[in-house]
């Protein structure tokens, strides 16, 4: 049986850590929807449309992955797409309590929505979008941390 799962985030910017989780999820599940959150409470480096396009470009090599922008409740989005589960990357103990609360809330809101936690590969365990933005803002080289599409988009912003 083939399952649809959702990997959601703001992806501002998408990192190689995100891509690692997506690639591994694509091997485990029939379809992976990368849900790019609009999140109006944040001041993003990239617009909603840019983030969605960059995720789409970064995942183009994965036939069973699609990028979709969304706003509103993730539980509602999951229902609309008949997803069986959410995939969440979990870097360490700092993430666990928050992620478990989020998983329980999404399950309650949807009626039944499991969450699958995937630890990142050791190479990317320390990496976050926040760190990439900080390196970028201080004119550091982020090439090793982001997919090529994101790197090109960052260079265009300079």
Curated annotation (Swiss-Prot):
It holds the Pfam family CTP_transf_like. Its cofactor is Mg(2+). It is found in: Cytoplasm. It catalyses: (R)-4'-phosphopantetheine + ATP + H(+) = 3'-dephospho-CoA + diphosphate. It comes from the Bacteria. GO terms for molecular function: ATP binding; pantetheine-phosphate adenylyltransferase activity. Its EC number is 2.7.7.3. Homohexamer. Reversibly transfers an adenylyl group from ATP to 4'-phosphopantetheine, yielding dephospho-CoA (dPCoA) and pyrophosphate. This is Phosphopantetheine adenylyltransferase. The gene is coaD.
